[in-house]
Amino acid sequence: MGPVVLFDKSFLQSLSVDESVWFDHFFLPVVSPLFFVETLADLTKQQRPGSLRTPEDEVRVIADKTPVLSGAPCVHHSQLCIANLLGHHAPHVGQIPVAGGRPVRGAEGKPGVVFENSPEAEAFARWQRGRFHEVERDLASNWRAMLSELNLPEIAQRIRALGITPQTCKSVEEAYGIAAALVHSRYEPQQQLGLLFAFVQMPAYLRASIVHRWSEAGFPPLAHYASYAAHVLQVELFFQIALAANLISADRPSNRVDIAYLFYLPFCHIFVSGDKLHRRCAPVFLTKQQDFVWAAELKDDLARINRELMATSEVERQQGLHTLAPRPPGDSSTLLVSLWEKHAFGSPSEDGAEPPFSHEAQRKLVEHVNSFAKAP
């Protein structure tokens, strides 16, 4: 099983359809809500002069490349943040939080969870056919509004109350350090929560219970109490500090959406992007067990793999992707192989090949999965 990878829209747009197939095959992609928002935003753009493709055509092309076999749409960060503050554990690296799980028991009484197709997955399937629903445009607009319609005077006042003076910050590393130090401290917990409530637009009816719950625990550092909520606050503080210190341009509105991809870093092994803001800022948030990969470099290696595997015989290709290439071809000097060696789940057999999977084993696996899917 391949590494879990977070990607942005710029990376997927850069791929050919064939390259996107190999990306979906060799990785477990995190389809973030930001990708959904950015893709739908293209519908509002004007058709480029001289181009034969309409905005709807452009979105259909992106939908054709969207990972559907291995990837999964991720729950919105605000919902994850609220759940974490209410006592639910946050997922860890390598776990994609997916909505809609239904607990069932299979034919032999074994417990399992069935996930129906998410609205986002169904939407991308329709977009491939050129069908767009107005409700999706509204949803994307609401998500975008959450990122752009902030009460800036309130946020500035709360940041000052926390003793933060962004103008003294000289680098993105310093901005990260200031934000990290705060969420790991017990300093002004009410102000910290006030900022977090403003950033995620916390529903009013939940605020008192969240404050009470943290108070009952003795106001430990937010990073120890609700690690994912602390991460969201840390990203938001980092961005506001970096803006005020002129480390990030305030003249580019898309920076607000771009930085929001960092909310989903805790779930991935790899973040791949072709965005310069991501290249500068994402590495300070990554652990030693995670990597940032520049989009052009991964695209080049996917193109190499496509050339090599398309040069195989028709008979070999007809056997399917999992038989043709259970692992990325190449040695440790190639990007995909090195990423797999560091991040892929499980270890290869001695000869580097996957163990054989017989037709009988495949049949039993299908029956096992179907027993869950058909369970009430």
Model segments located where?
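Active-site-proximal, substrate-binding regions of enzyme catalytic domains
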Residues: 2-267, 277-376
